[in-house]
Amino acid sequence: ILVNAAVDGEQLSDDEILYETLLILIGGDETTRHTLSGGTEQLLRHRDQWEQLVADAALIPGAMEEMLRWTSPVKNMCRMATADTEFHGTALREGDKMMLLFESANFDEAVFGDPENFRIDRNPNSHVAFGFGTHFCLGNQLARLELSTMTRKILQRLPDLRLADDTRLPLRPANFVSGLEKMPVVFTPIKPVLA
């Protein structure tokens, strides 16, 4: 599709195809993977909420939104001011670049009240894990479907899943998209799906 795509009648350059492919791979895989692992970690650290989900799958949509808020897989995004303006007392000139910190926004006390508490019943949950405005993630519905499906399957297949220990889990070093490096767990094996 990208090889044959055209913008204003011009085909994409090799570099544009490469960058779009990387964007699709990062946006369509890494972010969802990091949300699932980081969100699962929080559910396992808040055992009461894990047990609620095991007992009632109808709670998964709220849990998924809290997983997105908590993990904020895309840490930041740069934007350029399109006009002179003032932002919280700071003058910005047209062309100035600024970095938006999604993780900071998702832990804003003015928005979330108790942002440091992981709560699957948080409502409303006005997180910006998918960005906002004209830059809102086009894949947000696919990501939500993937997250809810995977979370449901993990809860069904591994209801007694636990972290191997209480040590802090290492994060993958990155300044744009980040998540857990590894997450040792223990569980009781069940009969394989495909025997």
Residue ranges of predicted features:
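Cytochrome P450
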Residues: I1-A195
